A protein has these predicted regions:
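Periplasmic/cell-envelope proteins involved in peptidoglycan metabolism and beta-lactam response
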Residues: 1-291, 302, 307, 324
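Active/ligand-binding-proximal structured segments within catalytic/core domains
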Residues: 93, 311-320
Length: 324
């Protein structure tokens, strides 16, 4: 009898224990469910309301700005080169360079996006893929330099993640080959390389400015915030050249070189009263607006660099000396 009661007592104790354990777990879970929202709300309030320097509003604002606010360069307009009458010999025209972030393109752009991009750029899909692979660890690369604004906008309108545009200036020479050696040309970064463009590069070059902008994840400018430093255009350069005389001298020289089957030729026209140079032309010449087929021997300004025999031009001086 005693053993039976003892067994029953043990059974009751086990049942009570089994009831207590689920209840303990229940209270633990419920306490966690109530405590977690309270902790989250408290933390959110701290981040959004309390101006704590380390983890509050200022911290979030700083972190957000660091990821979206950027300093953008404002390109400076290069000074004009004109003849004595103000006719343009070298001008700067606005263009757009296309920039890509290979990391974003590799991760976020679809195969269709890349095919559309290659078609818009006029290159094969294989070529584009090879370039992106080569720069896959970089966050910056040029897709195309100095495109006409409308052509670049067509690419930007595709809305492909990781592609943005940068405003630049490209030099244009209205007189073309007629003033090629005299005026010279600039490189793709707008630095003078030959002729007057090189000789007066410092004065012609402007000072770039900068501004604060907001950019999205793709690198596109969403909004201008403030101007940091304004851009200053370069100084204009007026030459003593008369473009009308320059055209006439160039045509006469080109005709004479062709007529006599000469390898080269130069002509200089001076104002006899002031000594100013009214025209200076050379053959062979080149088109400074398209230097894809440029030959080194056509770049040289022969009228300035080559040694030439004076020939009969000194005879008047000899006769004058004899008369005296």
């Amino acid at each position: 009898m005693g053993s039976i009661l003892a067994t029953k007592g043990k059974n009751v104790s086990k049942q009570q224990t089994q009831k207590l354990i689920p209840r303990w777990r229940y209270f633990l879970v419920m306490s966690g469910l109530f405590a977690l929202p309270i902790l989250l709300i408290t933390h959110i309030a701290q981040l959004q309301i309390m101006p704590d320097e380390e983890f509050g509003v200022d911290f979030l604002q700083t972190q957000g700005d660091a990821r979206s606010i950027r300093s953008e360069i404002i390109p400076a307009y290069r000074g004009l080169i004109t003849d004595r009458n103000g006719e343009p010999l070298a001008v700067s025209t606005p263009v757009t360079s296309l920039i890509a972030n290979p990391k974003h393109l590799q991760k976020l752009a679809s195969k269709k996006d890349l095919k559309d991009l290659s078609n818009a750029l006029g290159i094969s899909f294989t070529q584009l893929s090879a370039r992106l692979t080569r720069y896959r660890n970089k966050s910056f690369m040029y897709l195309a330099r100095q495109l006409p604004v409308n052509e670049a906008q067509k690419v930007l309108d595709l809305g492909i993640v990781g592609i943005s545009g940068r405003q630049e200036f490209k030099r244009f020479y209205p007189a073309g080959e007629v003033t090629a050696q005299l005026v010279g040309f600039t490189d793709i970064d707008d630095n003078g390389q030959e002729g007057m463009e090189l000789a007066y590069n410092e004065g012609l070059t402007g000072q770039a400015g900068s501004k604060k902008v907001i950019k999205d994840l793709t690198g596109r400018i969403i909004k201008d915030i403030s101007l940091i430093k304004p851009a200053h255009a370069g100084r204009d350069l007026r030459l003593s050249i008369d473009l009308r005389v320059q055209y006439a001298a160039y045509r006469a020289l080109k005709s004479a070189v062709q007529k006599h089957n000469a390898k080269s030729g130069s002509v200089v026209v001076l104002d006899v009263e002031t000594g100013e140079v009214l025209a200076m032309a050379n053959q062979p010449s080149f088109n400074p607006n398209d230097r894809s087929k440029l030959r080194p021997d056509s770049v040289r300004n022969r009228a300035m660099t080559d040694m030439m025999e004076p020939g009969s031009t000194v005879k008047p001086f000899a006769i004058l000396a004899a008369l005296e």
